[in-house]
Amino acid sequence: PPDDATLDKFCRLYVKTAQSAELLALWNVGAEREVIRGCDATRFTELRALEPYYHTRPWSAALAGKRVLVVHPFRRTILAQYEKRTQLFPGKDVLPELACLTVIQAVQGLGGQDTGYADWFDALTEMERRMDAADYDVAIVGAGAYSLPLAAHARDTGHAAIQMSGATQLLFGIKGKRWDDHPVISKLYNPAWVRPDETEGISNKEKVEGGSYW
């Protein structure tokens, strides 16, 4: 947000959407005490619970036969990788066959990237509009700071929604620098896994957590 008024609007939206979530995953950092105190009706879990490849019975197996909408910057790569889904997690039911997969290109404003929108909320509204035009049962969202409000929008319009954030790309066998030496994730890599398509980078990606997602 470029000014105090927009920042205040952003914070109020985030508090509202966090308080309305059915389930929140925690990083186990001190400031989360405020989240726990402020979300009376919310259940909490460990962060890894959102990442199905850690578990012998992955929650994502329940996506089988569902119409799934993904909101993520790596649209082209996700669609290509889904075609190789049986090769991504051999012997594990992490990415089952879906009734259909729709991917909406998430707006990327990271690293000072120009989004082409007047402000953050204009970009959010446009992504919500695209979601409303899609036919889906479940939304999986990995769209940076837009993720929580977009997941709430999916829920509020009658759909199931899971905010996987940065880990969304792993569900589709997409490598990222942050996981290259990870003791668990790096061992999931196989020849079917790829880096994001070169068209899906940003000019200042090294400013985004050291280029973690590429």
Feature map (PLM): residue ranges:
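Alpha-helix C-cap/termination motif
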Residues: T17, A133-A134, T157
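Gly/Ser/Thr-rich loops at beta-strand to alpha-helix junctions
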Residues: V29-E32, P73-T77, I140-P149, S165-Q169
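Short coil/turn segments at beta-strand junctions that form active-site/ligand-binding loops
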Residues: K66, D135-D137, H159
